[in-house]
């Protein structure tokens, strides 16, 4: 497995993207087996499972979150940031309502400023994936309202 090779080469965190075809077919048992198989290949790594929320219905996000709650993953990650829309506050809150404090949430993609970052954390994210880290830090150091969020993309 690629995850095992990555771990053998020094990785201590593994990101995996779920099979959306499994979700669309309703094969949540297969999805659970897939996620746990990757985790079993390098059990000492932190495992983040990317669900690409922009490709899923709300009902599918709920079912995937329920499935991941049964898995050995550490994080549910909203997106890669490269597939349509990134994280939304609504989807982070929806995932949090299912996994509660049993899994961590990483909101990724589309977080363009301090206001977005704070809102994602308030919605339940414990980590953020953003290419705007410098801007966010600057806004926080200078006061969140000192600059408008940059909405030119991620």
Predicted feature residues:
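Catalytic cores of alpha/beta
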Residues: 1-5, 56-67, 90, 94-97, ...
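Glycine-rich phosphate-binding active-site loops on the catalytic face of alpha/beta enzymes
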Residues: 8-23, 70-86, 107-145, 154
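Surface-exposed amphipathic alpha-helices with a cationic face
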Residues: 35-43, 93-100, 141
């Amino acid at each position: 497995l690629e995850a095992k090779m990555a771990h053998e080469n020094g990785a201590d965190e593994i990101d995996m993207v779920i099979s959306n075809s499994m979700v669309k077919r309703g094969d949540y048992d297969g999805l659970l087996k897939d996620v746990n198989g990757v985790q079993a290949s390098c059990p000492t790594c932190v495992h983040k499972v990317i669900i690409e929320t922009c490709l899923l219905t709300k009902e599918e996000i709920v079912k995937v979150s329920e499935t991941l709650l049964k898995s050995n993953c550490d994080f549910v990650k909203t997106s890669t940031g490269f597939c349509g829309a990134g994280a939304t506050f609504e989807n982070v809150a929806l995932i949090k309502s299912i996994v509660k404090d049993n899994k961590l949430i990483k909101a990724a993609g589309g977080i363009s400023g301090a206001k977005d970052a704070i809102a994602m954390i308030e919605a339940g994210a414990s980590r953020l994936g953003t290419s705007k880290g410098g801007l966010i830090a600057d806004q926080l150091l200078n006061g969140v309202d000192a600059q408008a969020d940059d909405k030119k993309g991620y």
